[in-house]
Amino acid sequence: MSSSPTPDGVTPAEELPVEPVPTPSSFARAMILVTVSICTMLYALTVTIVNVALPQLQGALSATPDQIAWVVTLNVIATAVVTPMTGWLVSRLGERPLLLWAISGFAASTLLCATATSLETLLLYRIAQGAFGAPIVPLSQSILLVNFTGKDRPMAQGFFGMTVVVGPAVGPALGGYFAEAHDWRWVFYLIVPLCAVAFLLVITFIRPASKEQSAKLDWTGFLALSFAIICMQLLVDRGERFDWFASREIIFYACGAALAFYLFIVHTLTSDAPFLNPQLFKDRNFALGLILVFIYGMLNFTPITLLPPMLHDLKGYPDSLIGLLLAMRGLGMVIGFFTAGRLGWLDPRVTFFVGMVLNGISGFLLAAANVDVSPDAIAWAGVLQGIGSGMMWVPLVTMSFATLPDRFMPDGSAIFHLLRNFGTSIFISISFMVVVRTARMNYAEFAENITPYKESLRFPVVTGAWDLETVEGLARIGDEMDRQAQMVGYDNAFIMYAIVCFLSLPLLLLVRVKRG
């Protein structure tokens, strides 16, 4: 929460004399970049690294699939609730102390997760982990944006962006290796040394900055926004599992989110000191950037969420090969970030346009896959998608924060990453809904055309080893129909992915770019 305007329109930050801050040297700025990147990476890794250990966790803690899902859900909810508080926490503690507290709490809660002996204690520690980790990414980006301006910002954002996006991409591979070689506890132990390194780097290279005047927390706005966030996150996480609005629980979440969000907006527009300063959203580029980062969140993690179950269930690929194919996407991201950083002189709308088009093309390539698709085809589509995502991130940050005043950076960065995470959660849920429902429809269509009385299916060249006269033969062909129907479901999800890419392009026409 940034300092809110007083009735005469002057913010408390403007009333206080601000001492000029000396410009850091090139080496100091380079170390600031390394520091905030490592801080971000240690949090970004935990976003996906735990997912691969869920089967082990379920067995070790004697939990049902629905119960073990809360290990992910509660962590995401805690992160989403605390993220908007980053600006207010900065005004109370300062950037450097807050970052140190966040890293310390994150390390302690991660270590406790590794020592959990019951599902209840693990869930409690995961909530703490999400809450302490929430300020790390927006705070790191805020520090970066203040220290890198002008022509230096694109290259710095390119390096920083790799840790934001590549971390979750390599998380499953690392988590899978340590979970198989040791056990699920090592998924958490792995993060602790990174926390220690990040803590030492922050102490050494992040300078204490002058605090803004401490602002009171707008509890009404905070609680309304928090309740809306909790309901929305539960809705998207549990919607498909409970058949969406056929469930009273999901209807309650939807109504609760709508009501709480309405109260938050009304309170923000009428309060003298709201939780989020409305001046944030008066910046045209930042407001458009929030829409674009929501779309970016929709696109970025969806492929790496859809591909593992598709390749494992329909192709029978081992986890090692799936991890390698996902790593190819990470390689593409590195290329994309580096390319976007080197193209800092180019209109950021052009770079973003190219990245979005590459994402759309990769979506159509994956949508053309069938059950006989080769690993090479998946790898090529992944590289292309990675390059596109990398090329989108740098100009997205450049456009969004180009005209936002420094005093709004903590709040702006927090909302920016909150919407990115929401976009990811919502689109992944929608994508799996498309997979499940269209697969069910296609299975029904296949079944209409597969009967023992159809003459064309009596030829050996068609049936192969299937004997339609036996129960076993019918079961085998039923399994194959299910496999083909699921493949069509995944294809439909990737078609939707590609369509979203191309339909989003006209938004770039609304972005204004400073000339000269």
Q: What are the roles of these predicted feature ranges?
A:
Residues 76, 83-221:
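Helix-loop-helix hairpins in multi-pass membrane proteins, especially solute transporters
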Residues 118, 180, 203-212, 241-242, ...:
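Transmembrane helix-loop junctions in multipass membrane proteins, especially transporters and channels
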Residues 22, 197, 415, 420-510:
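Hydrophobic transmembrane architecture of multi-pass small-molecule transporters
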Residues 2-43:
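Cytosolic juxtamembrane N-terminal segment immediately preceding the first transmembrane helix
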Residues 192-211, 226-238, 256-270, 505-512:
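C-terminal membrane-cytosol helix-exit motif in multi-pass small-molecule transporters
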Residues 51, 55, 68, 109-113, ...:
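Membrane-embedded alpha-helical segments in integral membrane proteins
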Residues 29-45, 50-54, 61-80, 87, ...:
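12-transmembrane solute porter fold
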Residues 19-23, 151, 199-226, 241-246, ...:
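Flexible interhelical linker loops that connect adjacent transmembrane helices
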